[in-house]
C-alpha cells in the first residue's frame, strides 16, 4: 500500500486537478490537497503548483511479480520453455504444436505467450495495440530516495512523468506512452 501524489506541473492545470481532487473526495477516497510549499517541504519537489495526495494506491514490481507467477505455476505443473524462440504455432483439435527456431516441437493443450512485441507476428487476431513507454532507473542509493518514501508521483504534463522508489532503494522515473513503431 502506498500513497500517491498527483501534482500540477503547470499553473493552467490547477483548476482541473482541483476538480479531480473534489471528485475523488466525493467518491470516498482519502485525499488531501497540498499546496506547492507543502509538496516542497515533504518531498523536496520544486516548481509544482499544488496537488492531490491519496492514501490508497499500490505499485507492483513487474519483474518480481512475473517471476513469482512463474514459480507458483511451475509448482502446479506448468512447463516453462524459457529462452525458446517460437517459429510457428499450429492449432489442432485436441492440442497445439509449437515449432521452435531450433526445429524442436512442443505439444500442449494450452500455450501462454510471454513474448511481448513479437506477439503480433505469431497471433493472427488483432487484439493488441502495442505501446512504448520510457523509463530510467537509478543506481541503488537508499539515502537519496528515502525522502520519497512509499509515494507514487504523477504530474499533469503531456507526456506525463511517473516516479517511484523501488524496494531495493532505486528511483524509477518513466512516462510518455506512445504507439509502438518497429
Where are these regions (language model features)?
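Active-site substrate-recognition segment that forms the wall
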Residues: 1, 86-91, 96, 105-143, ...
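Helical element adjacent to the flavin cofactor pocket in flavoenzyme catalytic cores
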Residues: 16, 22-25, 47-110, 114
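Short, structured patches in soluble enzyme cores that scaffold and shape functional sites
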Residues: 9-11, 102, 140
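Hydrophobic alpha-helical scaffolding
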Residues: 10, 58-59, 126
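Beta-strand segments within the central parallel beta-sheet cores of soluble alpha/beta enzyme folds
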Residues: 34-39, 83-87
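Dinucleotide-binding Rossmann-like beta1-alpha1 core, especially the glycine-rich loop
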Residues: 1-36
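Flexible hinge/switch segments at interdomain interfaces of large molecular machines
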Residues: 38-46
